[in-house]
A protein has these predicted regions:
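Single conserved hydrophobic/aromatic residue that forms the stacking wall/gate
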Residues: 1-14, 549
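Short, surface-exposed amphipathic charged segments that create phosphate/polyanion-binding patches used
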Residues: 167-171, 304-312, 432-433, 482-492
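Hard-cation-handling environments
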Residues: 246-391, 404, 439, 454-456, ...
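Short, compositionally biased "basic patch" segments
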Residues: 208-223, 310-317, 387-413
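Conserved acidic residues
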Residues: 9, 69, 220, 352, ...
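Generic long, charged, amphipathic alpha-helical segments
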Residues: 404-435
Length: 550
């Protein structure tokens, strides 16, 4: 089954007490958010911001933020956490649960995101004032981000936490980012326990610094990412060798290597590789070449990495630390904190490495470095991470001959390349290895967090391997229990580029709601076939009286 449909598992009246609503990152890779209603509680799993091209509209919360009891965070990336300050701004006052490293990283990442919101609003308002237009408000402010951080509770890995009677969770290291986790959730209702597992972003094998993903043995229902569910990374590349060759040929041309990098995780991996390159003398003829970290967020994140409990790191990193070696520090490493320091980086022609954020080139200082280096054929722009559809990074990788930066059209003459295989996400084989660790197979796997066709392809792959799998759309709602699952409400499959006019959209939406309600009612009726006559008679009376039955 490549996408969700109206077929269901076994369903009975007790199922409607636990519901899941898919709100974001379904048939797209950003804006992760799912609402769990169970054991008398309402919890969000992640609350992320959409980045890049918006393919399917994220759905509004079906309940007010003030009615949500808490949020469970899989990891600190903004596409999983970026809406938390907005949630708080709109009335959320519950607790936010995450691992301790995730909590520390969120403290800098949410504040940084808020600064970006404020800066963009200020920039738009300057333009609006000149045009006589109405001012705009930032999505949220630094104050909102700080208020959100007050609600965080840092948790240990592998420790069960009771959130409420009948609702227990546990964080398991999933090897995607420092502090990243899968989340196990046990829901007990009417004396029956159902186990859910949210994969979070599943890490790639053999990443530097952090551990490999931990697998989980049992679950009734699994909700798993599928970012690279249609492809293989291939044999593990020689990252150090490939990076050293890129540096060598670029420096020999007299150019800079500009690396758009995620400030958290990928930047620290690059420092790990460059330390090895310098230690082994793999780049020759350029002395102690300078390496700049030009991202205040990356600088703060690097500090958090250095202060983290070594138990969070892999065996190689722990061995270096035990010898008193800092695995992400080396001669020639320079940090740029202020804007003046950032501007000075491009003031000379000394070949250098510039690592700057954001990783998809959508914001931040990287855009200034692209402006100064994209037009220079001696330079290299090196991408080291996933580039979402619609981002400037994806545009460059796809072969753009020119791009617009700060109102100017810039010719793309620099070498554009990728450090292949360097990914924080598992490929198809890694995803299959993770899900095949469940024994017995889960009752159903919900495939999420993947580009449109990738989700369908990976759901079909799982089906061919004997899993019951589907790929829900934003707005889709399922009732789930120990006996089975049933789709209560179909998600929206209208792509934004094909979105009808507002009036037509409203009419279509209302009619679709009516059709969905009818299908939902028929499904519940069919699954009560064979029930006790007394219960069926009561059910019929409820329908006759037009009372809510679902």
């Amino acid at each position: 089954m490549s996408q969700s449909d109206w077929s269901s598992d076994v369903c009975s009246s007790d199922l409607v007490s636990m519901k899941l609503t898919f709100l974001g990152a379904n048939h797209e890779v950003t804006g992760s958010c799912t609402l769990l209603e169970a054991a008398g509680q309402r919890y969000l799993i992640d609350c992320g911001m959409e980045q890049g091209k918006d393919v399917y509209e994220n759905q509004p919360f079906p309940v007010a933020p003030g009615e949500i009891d808490g949020v469970l965070v899989t990891h600190a990336h903004i596409d999983h956490t970026g809406q938390l300050p907005l949630l708080v701004r709109n009335g959320f006052r519950g607790r936010i649960y995450a691992t301790k490293p995730t909590t520390q990283l969120c403290s800098i990442m949410l504040r940084d995101s808020a600064h970006i919101q404020e800066f963009e609003a200020e920039w738009k308002n300057r333009k609006a004032k000149r045009a006589g237009a109405e001012p705009v408000e930032p999505m949220y402010t630094v104050q909102d981000a700080e208020a959100a951080m007050q609600l965080f509770r840092g948790m240990e890995y592998n420790t069960k936490i009771e959130l409420a009677p009948g609702l227990v969770i546990r964080f398991i290291d999933v090897g995607h980012l420092l502090g990243s986790s899968s989340i196990e959730i046990w829901v007990t209702e009417s004396g029956t326990t159902t186990k859910l597992v949210f994969s979070g972003d599943i890490g790639n094998q053999h990443q530097p610094i952090i551990k490999d993903p931990t697998t989980i043995r049992d679950a009734d229902y699994v909700f798993m990412e599928s970012t690279y569910g249609d492809r293989s990374h291939g044999p593990r590349p020689d990252y150090v060798g490939e990076l050293s060759r890129i540096l060598q040929r670029t420096f020999d041309r007299g150019g800079n290597v500009v690396i758009p990098s995620f400030a958290v995780g990928r930047t620290q991996e690059l420092l790990y590789f460059i330390r090895e390159i310098k230690k082994e003398g793999l780049v020759t003829g350029h002395g102690n070449f300078p390496v700049y970290i030009d991202s205040p967020l990356a600088i703060e994140a690097t500090r958090i990495f250095k202060d983290t409990d070594p138990d969070c790191f892999d065996e190689d990193t722990r061995a270096l630390l035990a010898q008193g070696i800092d695995p992400i520090q080396f001669p020639g490493l320079q940090v740029s904190v202020t804007s003046d320091e950032s501007r000075m980086i491009n003031a000379d022609r000394v070949p250098k490495v510039i690592i700057s954020a954001s990783g998809m080139c959508e914001a931040g200082r990287i855009r200034h470095h692209l402006k100064h280096n994209l037009w220079r054929p001696e330079c290299t722009i090196l991408f080291v991470g996933y580039q979402a559809v619609g981002t400037l990074g994806r545009t460059l990788i796809d072969g753009a001959v020119n791009v617009k930066l700060f109102g100017e059209t810039i010719d793309v003459q620099a070498e554009i390349c990728q450090l292949t295989g360097l990914s924080g996400h598992a490929d198809r084989e890694g995803l299959l290895a993770w899900v095949n660790a469940f024994s017995p197979k889960p009752k159903r796997v919900f495939v999420i967090h993947g580009e449109d066709e990738v989700e369908n392809i990976f759901a079909q792959t799982l089906t061919e391997q004997g899993f019951t799998a589907c790929a829900p759309y934003n707005g889709e709602q399922w009732a789930i229990g120990a006996e089975g699952a049933v789709c209560l409400q179909e998600g929206s499959r209208v792509r934004l580029e094909h979105k009808p006019s507002e009036g037509a959209s409203r009419a279509a939406t209302v009619f679709q709601r009516l059709v969905s309600a009818g299908k939902r009612l028929l499904r519940v009726i069919e699954h009560n076939e064979g029930g006790a006559n007394k219960d069926l008679a009561k059910f019929a009376d409820q329908i006759k009286d037009r009372k809510s039955v679902v």
